[in-house]
């Protein structure tokens, strides 16, 4: 692990201290976008700051919206790259059946994006930000729920606090209902991302949607329900880049591939704590993350 980290730091250091060899005079700025939640915004800010350190001009277009909105912006050419999750791309964008081998999933997504959209998936990070459902210790004991199978059966007695995408995405509630059966909740209410945890803590819900790198899980000692039938695939994050941007700025690949190994589960949980709980600005958290690792 230390050898890998040292090698990653060396690679990133060499990438980030490149002179302006990639910044062609008059080249259009690379437009870096993100989806509309703290983790994606923060990682996009890390990508943007790393590119700027390598003298690649950057324009930020953060907080665009859902997966569909970000992908539409890529297809129109409104943005040149953004962070995406392998499982989300496979199921929600490509509408393909889940794959549970993370490497096979990445290769499938990489090939399909190249063929369908003329977009390149760069190196994925080890962080796996899977979807999930969580509850409080009290509710888990009261209803005897520790797994998704338990929750599927108990759902008619439970109120769900969900982010808006969860009620419609194929890899979310509709998929759970089809795959596990059940999951017919007593009540479903949608909240802005992050506020589902507030509803859970205030007793306005019994179960909430979660991402496994969310800092609120540890802060509030929540119970993440085990995916005992293995519904969800891997959700490794990687930069998705329009081929036209790579042709204009080929050094993007080296810069962002050097970042990839540093985005581990623990590193991303720490970033999420800083941004989503301690309310740091994502750009500030990103700059501190890079400074800590290559200075």
Listing of model-derived features with the role each one plays in the protein:
Residues 1-14:
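N-terminal secretory signal peptides and thylakoid transit peptides that target proteins
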Residues 19-20:
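C-terminal motif of bacterial Sec signal peptides marking the signal peptidase cleavage site
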Residues 131-141, 236-249:
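A bilobed periplasmic-binding-protein/Venus flytrap-type ligand-binding module shared by bacterial periplasmic
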Residues 62-78, 86-91:
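Acidic helix-start/capping segments at beta-turn-to-alpha-helix junctions
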Residues 27-59, 64, 126-198, 202, ...:
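Bilobed "Venus flytrap"/periplasmic-binding protein-like clamshell domains
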Residues 75-84, 156-158, 201-210:
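Alpha-to-beta junction loops
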Residues 39, 165-167, 171-172, 177-179, ...:
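An extracytoplasmic/periplasmic, membrane-proximal ligand-sensing/linker region
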Residues 93-103, 107-122, 202-204, 216-230:
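Ligand-binding "clamshell"
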